[in-house]
Amino acid sequence: ATGVTTVAATGLLAASAHMLFRFAIDTQWKHSIFHQALIAPDREGKMNQGEAKEAEQWFSETKQPVSITSRDGLKLHGWLFDPDCIDPTPHIYAICVHGYTGAPEEQAKWAHRYARMGFTVLAPSQRAQDLSEGRYVGMGWLERNDLLDWIRLIVDSDDQARILLFGGSMGATTVMMTTGTPELPRNVIAAIAESGYTSARMEFIDSARGMFHMPKLLASACVDAAGLICKRRAGYDFTEASCIPSLRHTVIPMLFNINELMIFGL
């Protein structure tokens, strides 16, 4: 009986881990979070609606398409915006990185603010989201290399560029995972991380406990098993997707802004 129980428990854990992986990471699975309206597009709720509406119109009317090819062969899309002021300062850029289940449009308000301050603004689509190719979301770990390549696109066209990185939610974690990498060009002079998370593993454990009412031990086991599936399918483990090692090596000024937790903890 004990053996049967063990086999059944192992099977249930494996099934739960597989479900978690597909729900949280696989953007092509029709039952994943990416096909459900679990996260509101406006992460700031009803705040500054007038400004948001103006920014959305500006975003739609002035966006210029741009694209790169990722290191693993995916075509990544983004939008470029000219400064929206009379006498912009040359060579200053802001890259606004959207979050989990998001799109560049969710950064419209911030992109417009930076453009009005004289920045040339880039708002990329994260891999496997919006217009960019890919199937699996990297929780910032895979996306950090994509962000480095977007930075390189700017630096290659303007070697005097001074770049500000801004990210919200998973975009904030992408920024944090990028700032401490040895490849980061000196052109990146500052970063802002809004409502990011430090570890994908801990984020998923907290989410599993909150959404599915799992005990902590079971949630940890399920997430760790899902991480093994993720390693095989997407090329990374949830334990790798942590910004703490990067932040230890970050030397540029960085502002951290912590807001209320979003649904699914992201």
Regions found by a protein language model. Name each.
Residues V137-D158:
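Alpha/beta-hydrolase active-site loop
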Residues P90-G99:
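Short beta-strand element of the alpha/beta-hydrolase
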Residues M177-T239, P245:
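Hydrolase active-site cap/lid region
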